[in-house]
Amino acid sequence: VDIQSLRGMPDLFPEDLEKWHILEKTLSKVFLSCGTKEIRTPLLESTELFNRSVGNSSDIVNKELYSFLDRNDKSISLRPEGSASVIRAIIQKKQEHEKHKLWYQGPMFRYERPQKGRFRQFHQAGVEYLGYEEGLSEYELISMVIQLNQRLGIKKYKIKINHLGDKDTKENFCNALKLFLEPHLDTLHEKDVARLESNPLRILDSKEESTQNLLATAPRFQDFLSESPKTFLTNIVQHFTDQCDIAVDSSLVRGLDYYTGLVFEVVSEDLGAQDAFLGGGRYDHLSKELGGKGMEAIGFAIGLERIIDLMQIQPLQNVQKVAFITVGEQD
């Protein structure tokens, strides 16, 4: 029997890699020009890292982690995303008191159902600003996103932003949402009923049509925000509206539990159902969750497979190939 590659883990051949090389070089040039430095973290981490960062209620931890016991019966996992590993590395090196602008790139792993734009081994590049409080850093990262799209020739895209407020804001909204949805439990998908118990905010991210129909008349997260984050969102939209298509989306919560403050997502209709190719936000409490002293943080990650599909840049055609022939004198 022929040995095949694992499902959702495709090979990349030379003809595929021409675009990949253009993308990787463009990413590193833009990241470096914006003052970030590269960091590399292991593919394998303690499973506890992702339980405490991504969140026990998330689909990633519950269904998608590639985890196994090593020979010392320690549970370890292939990384499903990059931010948690970067924060762990900074805590481990005792550098939380310093400011960092870092970027990374490499393979990630999630046990998902393979489909267009979604693989079990996929590649991400990301940027993390550590030690930078809310304000200018949000503007810098969105500017970087716009610059990346310009350099890659991606013209048709939209930036969606939202603000997740503070702990009290989330708690008040989640209580109101539960009160609204509890009389309708029989119409909710079982996955969304479970979300309602573990983390009601995640229901906003539901893909179930029946749930989305209910949410159309549910309490809006924006109505629970104080004036300060609302003004912050308005100012960001006004600042960038001449440069790109950008708007507030009050249903945007992102798929990872560690986000606080601003969250954003970049989508393109050209990608179909899996339309997001970049996402990020602020996660000021993550370092404490991982045993650190606390550190402001904001970042984003790009799905490279999805951005490859959008790139308007074509690999150079008819490149001259040079052959070197060694000529020597014969004795």
Describe the function of each predicted region.
Residues 1-17:
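Auxiliary tRNA-acceptor-end handling modules of aminoacyl-tRNA synthetases
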Residues 161-175:
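Short, conserved secondary-structure transition motifs
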Residues 61-70, 175-204, 268-270:
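Acidic, His- and aromatic-enriched active-site or binding-groove loops in soluble protein domains
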Residues 38, 75-78:
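A positional/architectural concept
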Residues 53-57, 173-175, 262-265:
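Short low-complexity, flexible loop/linker segments enriched in glycine and/or proline
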Residues 43-76:
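Polyanion/phosphate-binding surface patch
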Residues 16-36, 45-46, 63, 81-96, ...:
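Positively charged, Gly/Ser-enriched RNA/tRNA-binding surfaces
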Residues 156-165, 192-196, 247-253:
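Short, surface-exposed recognition loops or helix-turn segments adjacent to catalytic cores
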